[in-house]
């Protein structure tokens, strides 16, 4: 479409918004909260916000969509989106409206209530234990039906575990963290805790950040143009890595090393003492760890 309004500034709305913008659509995002992508902290969001502004994506925050009405016919057909912002009603005329909010679990009407399966406090998701067992003997639940995070890779891991349990193996779903990736422009990766989350849990942390503009491989991929970086959050006293975040082109490919570091309880020194090939994007992780330790080589 020539113009599209996206209701919802979460990861789904932003991923599709970036894609539509690159395809030539005029995109407007209507978000009810104070910020877009509120699941990420301000520092991580900033390069994305710069990209959206540069590509003339209009963003309305603290705006609540109230309804839509189709006007005209044929080539002149438009959709009017009505939304409230700053105690005023606004109307936006576009070719299409994409609603990316308001997802609800489709857990009603399947006879679950007749099988002795207990739901969580919200009544929407199936309650499970660390082996994905439900309250009904012999019945397991994995993926979205069992609640957040509703991610395909979590569901796959749970499914593999349940298959092994059924085969007689002793397994539990005890993950330190599950990677969250936002495929926007630029990409965003987060595993574990960000600085604010760590401090809210009473952790005394040290933080290191390395810019992609100082990474040779990122320069060849033009990833430095996004203002991206890799950030490491570690406990100050024992140097255990608590979280890793990254923003920039192609950073999704770094998520495997990030999550492995957390899952294995890596210390900053473990990563610092690991040789990372040059020139690769993974050097950015190594450099951010060195920065956290105060031994930065390619940044100040």
Regions of interest found by a model, annotated:
Residues 1, 91-166:
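FAD-site-proximal beta/loop scaffold in flavoenzymes
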Residues 2-5, 11-90, 149-156, 164-197:
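Rossmann-like dinucleotide-binding cores of NAD(P)H-dependent redox enzymes
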Residues 8-13, 102, 143, 243:
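Conserved phosphate-binding and hydrolysis motifs of nucleotide-dependent enzymes
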Residues 14-15, 107-109, 149, 218, ...:
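Glycine/Thr-rich phosphate-binding loops of Rossmann-like dinucleotide-binding domains
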Residues 54, 86, 121, 128-130, ...:
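Short, acidic, Ser/Thr-enriched surface-loop or helix-capping motifs
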Residues 67, 116, 131, 231-233:
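Short, surface-exposed charged micro-motifs
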Residues 75, 116-118, 221-227:
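Short loop/turn motifs at secondary-structure junctions and domain boundaries
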Residues 167, 183-194, 199-300:
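Flexible, glycine-rich terminal cap/loop adjacent to redox cofactors
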């Amino acid at each position: 479409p020539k113009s599209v309004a996206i209701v919802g500034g979460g990861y789904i709305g932003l991923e599709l918004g970036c894609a539509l913008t690159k395809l030539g659509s005029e995109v407007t995002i209507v978000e009810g909260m104070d910020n877009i992508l509120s699941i990420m902290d301000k520092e991580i969001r900033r390069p994305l916000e710069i990209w959206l502004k540069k590509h003339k994506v209009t963003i309305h925050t603290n705006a609540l969509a109230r309804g839509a009405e189709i006007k005209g016919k044929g080539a002149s057909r438009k959709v009017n989106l009505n939304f409230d912002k700053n105690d005023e009603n606004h109307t936006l005329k576009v070719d299409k409206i994409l609603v990316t909010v308001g997802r609800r679990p489709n857990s009603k009407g399947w006879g679950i209530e007749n099988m002795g399966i207990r739901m969580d406090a919200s009544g929407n998701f199936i309650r499970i234990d660390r082996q994905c067992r439900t309250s009904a003997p012999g019945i397991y639940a994995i993926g979205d039906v069992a609640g957040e995070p509703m991610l395909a890779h979590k569901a796959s891991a749970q499914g593999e575990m349940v298959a092994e349990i059924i085969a007689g193996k002793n397994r539990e779903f005890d993950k330190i963290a599950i990677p969250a990736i936002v495929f926007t422009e630029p990409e965003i990766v987060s595993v574990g805790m960000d600085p604010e989350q760590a401090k809210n849990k009473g952790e005394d942390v040290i933080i290191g950040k390395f810019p992609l503009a100082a990474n040779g491989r990122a320069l060849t991929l033009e990833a430095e143009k996004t203002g991206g970086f890799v950030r490491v959050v570690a406990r100050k006293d024992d140097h255990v890595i608590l979280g890793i975040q990254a923003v920039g082109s192609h950073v999704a490919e770094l998520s495997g090393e990030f999550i492995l570091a957390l899952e294995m309880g890596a210390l900053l020194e473990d990563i610092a003492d690991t040789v990372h090939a040059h020139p690769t994007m993974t050097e950015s992780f190594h450099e951010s760890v060195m920065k956290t330790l105060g031994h930065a080589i390619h940044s100040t």
